[in-house]
Each structure stands twice: as C-alpha cells, then as structure tokens.
Amino acid sequence: MNILLINGPNLNLLGTREPEIYGNKTLNDIEKDLNKVAKEKSINLECFQSNHEGEIVDKIQSSVSSISGILINAGAFTHTSISIRDALIGSKIPFVELHISNIFSREEFRKESFLTDKAIGIISGFGITSYFLALEGIIEFLSINN
C-alpha cells in the first residue's frame, strides 16, 4: 500500500513557526516518525511539501497510478485553493484532511475548508498527533475498502 503525505505552505517552518500553536517538532522529525510507523505496518509512505499551489496539484495528478491514499495538510491552501480541491476530486484517490491546530476554533477565515466535504475524514486539533491519527485512519479505510 502506497500513501502520499502532502504538506502545504509554511509547514516547512514547523519547529520554529508559532510553536505555541504548532509545537516544536520539525517537519523532518514528523516525517521520520511517520515513516517508522508506516514501515511497521508494511506501508510505503511518500512525503512531499511545497509552498506552491501548482506543485501540489502536479504531485496529486502524477500520483494517480501509484498512490492508494493521500494525507493532506494543505496549510493556508485549505481555505483558498479550488485547484487543489479539483485535483483531489479528479484523482479519485481517497484522502484525509489533517490539521495540527483546530481550524474550527481559530480565526473566522480558517473555519472554511475547500477540502472537508470531499475528504473521507478530517483530523484537526490534536497537534502533531493529528498526522498519526490520519495515517491510522487512511490505513483502516483502505484496508476495509480495497
């Protein structure tokens, strides 16, 4: 089983950007820890991060034939990107939307997601643990539905 983790803009700054909201772990730390969990479950996890909307769209489109499921923390693109939404829909790859913070308890503009209604699930507000919960969720979903 191949799963793609996509991280959007500014998530490369984890560990230094607003640690009171996002914690102290770097994206590299999170990816290493997630890969350990994935390997224990015989899952191939590919990690991708970009600050550029088009690169994320390209990655989704190029993954159609090789990826079983997607985990996506689209960052600020969650609230703005119709093109990422359309790429996810067009790919027909099941995806879990995830967020470190609870986007529904933050600023008004963060409460709207262009992805939620098309995701198989959403994990939000559990800090870095959101990544691990999302991984467990997509594995379970794919195990039942494939």
From Swiss-Prot:
Protein name, UniProt field: 3-dehydroquinate dehydratase
PANTHER family, alphabetized: CATABOLIC 3-DEHYDROQUINASE
Reaction(s) catalysed by this chain's protein: 3-dehydroquinate = 3-dehydroshikimate + H2O
Gene Ontology BP, a term: aromatic amino acid family biosynthetic process
EC number, as in UniProt: 4.2.1.10
Family: Belongs to the type-II 3-dehydroquinase family.
One protein family per Pfam: DHquinase_II
Catalytic residue positions: Y22, H99
Species name: Prochlorococcus marinus subsp. pastoris (strain CCMP1986 / NIES-2087 / MED4)
Gene: aroQ
Molecular function terms from GO: 3-dehydroquinate dehydratase activity
Gene3D superfamilies: Dehydroquinase, class II
Biological function: Catalyzes a trans-dehydration via an enolate intermediate.
Xref: SUPFAM superfamilies: Type II 3-dehydroquinate dehydratase (SSF52304)
Positions that bind substrate: N73, H79, D86, I100, S101, R110
Pathway: Metabolic intermediate biosynthesis; chorismate biosynthesis; chorismate from D-erythrose 4-phosphate and phosphoenolpyruvate: step 3/7
Quaternary structure note: Homododecamer.
Keywords: Amino-acid biosynthesis, Aromatic amino acid biosynthesis, Lyase
